[in-house]
Amino acid sequence: MAFVHLHNHTEYSLLDGLTHIKDMVRRAAELDMPAVAVTDHGVMSGMVELSDACDAIEKETGKRVKPIFGCEVYFTPDESLRKDVKPKLYHLLLLAKNNEGYHNLLKLVSESHVDNFYYKPRT
């Protein structure tokens, strides 16, 4: 039975991740994992690097590691979007199922930085 890590933080998760994407993809290929996800805190900065690393490892080893695009967002109830209230933040892991989901996730994360940033990007 195949195993896939669906919750991984990389160097793009400030103060929380240490893993380099290329190293993670290489290790996933060594362990014959069919896929690996990147779910950094509040950002989608590593998605192109993840895709490129998966393509590169397939060319190098012949093993395909499918990239799974995701984000661990800081979810907050509507009343916590006000800046005069201490925000209640909950971690919510979101994974893109397909291209439409990927674009929706990009939109959510972008809006969290542009419209709802208060100490952290809030969704």
Functional labels for PLM-detected ranges:
Residues M1-T123:
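Phosphodiester-processing cores and adjacent nucleic acid-binding clamps
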